[in-house]
Amino acid sequence: MEVQTQALTLWAKSGDPFHPLLAHMLDTAAVAWAILEREPGRTRKLYATDWNLGEKEALPWVAFLAGLHDLGKASPVFQAAWDEGAKRVWDAGLTWDEELVREQWVAHGVFTELYVKDVLKRHGLPLRLADPLAKGLGAHHGFLAQGEELKTARLHVKSEASTWQEVRDHLALRLAQSLGLNLPLVLPVEDAEAPAILRVMALASFADWIASDPRFFPYGRDPEALEYWQDALELARKALEDLPWPRVSPRGVRRFEELFPFSPNPLQSSVPELLEKTPGDSVLLLVEAPMGLGKTEAALYASHLLRERLDHRGLYVALPTQATANGLFNRIREFLERLSGGERWELQLQHGAALLNPQYAELLERARPMEVYDLELERNPGQESGGVAASTWFSAKKRAMLAGHGVGTLDQALLGVLKVKHHFIRLWGLMNRVVVLDEVHAYDTYTSGLLKSLLLWLRALGSSVILMTATLPKKKREELLSAWGVGGVELPPYPRVAAFSGGGLLGARHVPLEEKTLHLQGAPTEVSQVAEALKEQLPGALGAIVNTVDRAQALYQALGEGERLTLDELLDSFGAGPNQGAWPGLWEIREEKGRWVVGKRLKDGTLVFLLHARFPAEERALREAVTLALFGKHGPRPEKAILVATQVAEQSLDLDFDLLYSDLAPVDLLFQRAGRLHRHTRKRPEGHQTPVLLVGGLTDEPEFGRELHWNRVYEDYVLLSTWLALQGRETVKVPADLEGLLEEVYERLPEGFPDSLRDRARKSYQNLIDRLQKDASMAGNLSLAELDRLLSQLDASALASDFRLDDEEENASTQRFLTRLGEPSVSVVPLYRRGEEWFLDADGRRPAKMKGDLGKEDVLALWSRAVRLSRFPIPQTLLGEKPPSAWAKSGLLRGLRPLEVGREFPRKELALQVDLDPELGVVYRLV
């Protein structure tokens, strides 16, 4: 039988009719081709430069490589996996060793690596190019092939008849001919650089996802038909239109006032000045300025300028927490609406609880009538096709980074430099993009180490970066700039904006600002005394930010007994309120969540609220919205109210307190918290005309352990140095004093402490240095801290790949490779048992499905109750238990574990009982 006929019997997708392997290879190549057609010209130029080709020559070459991704399916092991298909192949004369195939299974991606290397070499490509390309394409299902897999695969290859190689050669030749690619292959490039390989392996992977969807590429089409390639290309273009794949046209530079409803301040005006002569290379923009000065608007305007001048594909704004991402989401959306000019722009909210955000849910609903991807929904002919929306296809965790625009946590980006499943697709999504990294001072040494690896890759992939910070120690600033390839530059005094490109300084500006005086007062640490100190400061909208959840719960209780306050009661007490900010959104969810507890009302009418990370996700989201509505810029300002919060209120949330209490924290974080004081211009209650920060622990002896546990949250040495720096200081001038205080705290050596504290300082300093070195080393070892590690299997970064870690799963292994170090933790769903049934609520009105098939509503109901816990031994116990069978089938739920409310976890002495309180959230008790 002719090789051509034999090749057509090979199947890629089973069914009746089946989908031939050649057809799928052509479909995938067509998708890759169509994606690059839609991408900005700069993306195509990056692909062309990778191989020293013109854009017209690069397009068929890259599409050809994408089409080869499934060449491993032309193997006996794969073809034998479907009985009907196997018989057809066998009858065509392609046979195999049945015993070997049955007993030695190998994934087809492993065969792809071996076959592609062989095919490329025999068609003229040198080994130095064929080998890395084959490795990258073999990883299209998420991971590089491992040594043992390759060893077994080679046994199979040795047992194959020569006809198999001839068939694979025919497939490659037929693919090349369809694309107009001449063989033998001649590439005018010496080596395949890591960014070039990443661009190919990622494109092949997600082109495969799209080409594998029969709704876009129906089965039954004959790949031998003369018009097959052109038809596949048209199907690919239509599929991308339907998703819709981003297509952002250059629109010309707009003035700041056109995009924001106010004129730029000095900080914001400095951005276009620095970026006026942007070169063709990527840009790093560093914005260092105090809180509340419009850094976000400055960054967004900079992203607009960079996109227009450098032809970037989109924007990703990375923040420290889900709360900060939620807080910025609507502002980013409004900015993009003004910028899009009626064009359809994609915006995804990227973090674990995104579906609970009402603004994001609204964007998903807005997109659905436009989509054909979800066949359960019909197009609405009257629906507008322009504006900002969030498509179903891009809302999946691994695909979200491919969207044109995103707001999310830094973790979502950092996973790109850890070898978790499909990490390279995350990096591709950030390629040729403007990436805003906010609050870069907020990360520990380990996370900062991963951040440096991310900066290395972003520059290599042609992205521009905007680093934003209120306060950044000099050493940390130098490390981040060094990761971008910049060193030895002198910068003007703080506050400042600086731009870098090509390893050098483009320009820098000192930003003169009106000085603000912050008054410091020492405060007690005992919660009952803190509660009394706060109540003495009423009336006013007061805040208290403490260092631990247990302490927040204790302070909330110490403020006194009160009636539970539901959302219904809160809304009724203030009425319709302003039509701005988060307040209108609370009215929209009243019918669904009106009976939910959001706080308490004391006998004297004072409203008390609690916000921390140990509430189930939907309750935390509601409390977050209430907090923003009442303590934000536009809310119905309560006359007497106190918010007790943990670090979730520390960053990016637009809160404005008349007075703030804070536990002692590292100086940079302490003044980050102080940025919530008198944030906006408004009439203040009597006694609150000047901003006052009460600091717990400032007047006491510096004891941060024992029942406080502050030294488990922050380094004892940094707390000690902060405590010393603030002794005797009654005011801080912002911004004049901030940089000096920062350097004093972080550059102080043990010899700079008084005699009474020097021994303790020496010990805690050595502990700090040891841990910093260990964490920095771990980040450097585990991440892609060097570009050449992309395909390496011989360094520590390969460990995540060896464990086959999927960021959608949660088990004991995934805990070793988190984007942030700390105690092990696990996401749980608190459940109530009634007989043999489980419920999400104590009243037994919301069933929790554990078996069978789950609908979308079932999944969302379970997911919305998730809460992450880290108290020993909860994670250690639950991560050893498998999720319920129904949950394991769901990408959203497989990382969760059920937790019966009231369950006791044995320990050496007293057991730990876990309860759920409507006012306090998850509560731990020793029993």
Question: What spans do the regions from the language model cover?
Answer:
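Accessory nucleic-acid engagement/destabilization modules that flank
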Residues: E2-R251
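Conserved pre-motif I regulatory segment
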Residues: R251-E288
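Walker A/P-loop
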Residues: G280-S303, Y443-D444, T469
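Conserved Walker A/P-loop ATP-binding site and its immediately adjacent core
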Residues: R313-E337, L347-P358, L472-R477, V549
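A substrate-engagement module of RecA-like helicase motors
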Residues: I332-G404, L410-L414
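Post-DEXD/H (motif II) to motif III coupling segment of the RecA-like Helicase ATP-binding lobe
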Residues: I425-V434, H441-G507
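C-terminal helicase lobe and adjacent C-terminal extensions/tails of nucleic-acid helicase motors
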Residues: R477, S528-P636, F657, Y661-V927
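Conserved interdomain linker/interface between the two RecA-like ATPase lobes of SF2 helicase motors
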Residues: G487-Y556
